[in-house]
Amino acid sequence: MMKESLSRGMLRVAMCGCLLCGGIPLAAQTQEYLSAVWSPDLGNGMYKNPVIHADYSDPDVCAVGNDFYLTASSFSCVPGLPILHSKDLVNWKVVNYALKELVPTDFYATVQHGRGVWAPSIRYHNGEYYIYWGDPDFGVYMVKAEDPAGEWSEPVLVKAAKGIIDPCPLWDDDGKCYLAYAWAGSRAQINSVLCVAEMNAEGTKVVGPSRIVYDGNDDVNHTAEGPKFYKRNGYYYLMFPAGGVQMGWQMAARSRNVYGPYEARRVMEQGDTPVNGPHQGGWVQTASGEDWFVHFQDKGCYGRVTWLEPMTWKDDWPVVG
């Protein structure tokens, strides 16, 4: 960041000087005007947030052995669904894009700012990586690949609907597959509602009725969205943000039955620092059993940057931060 700025008059003088002398040699430019590269790795086993100081909205992450893969919303950008890889959850590198073009192609043949890929989830199941995302105008799509850095399949429309967003699959111990998702009030005229529906075992089609499992309109946890679906110690968990992007907090809801009833509590508060959020993200466990939570913070013109938080469990409830 520049430590001082030029007034308009000084800027005119500087520009005239450049015209007269033919430009200022690069060597004459001082170091104080060069931007530093952001590095979250402090080099001593510690890190600082954000771990990704760039616009990766609604991140989700999965672990396979010692490899971590992250994807995020790409909206109407092409290629879409960036795939980032890391060995330590701190140092990330873009290795691929899972979506070559948006579908339906005729609709996205023209600019559709803010539409497209909303809040994807990434999972590993039976030797394949799956990414699900919601298009608020068309429904839930899925792509899959054996190698995240390789070729991804063509998108499959898992559930056609207007207003469904933030989908996340869960393969249960008995082989059944479920989909959790939220609603966009701008399309469906409802929000703060989380639903679960059964899919076929392949995860390619919703085959059962949708059931409301959490209604944030009935309590103080409004604007419930972005559910991530997990199972641990016999409990089904929905981890999701509430309260809004800039003023919200993290929630967890759990039940012994996939369709509920779910009991819910806050697991990470807003806090009283200038840092807003925490907003949408996901839980990941390392090969050594450590638990971490990745989420985004809305940083205005810098975009939605990615934070990494330690996570523990107490009485079968997650504790984030």
Predicted regions and their residues:
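Extreme N-termini of proteins with methionine-enriched Sec-type signal peptides or N-terminal signal-anchor
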Residues: 1-2, 28
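Bacterial N-terminal signal peptides that target proteins for export
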Residues: 2-14
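Bacterial N-terminal signal peptides
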Residues: 12-23
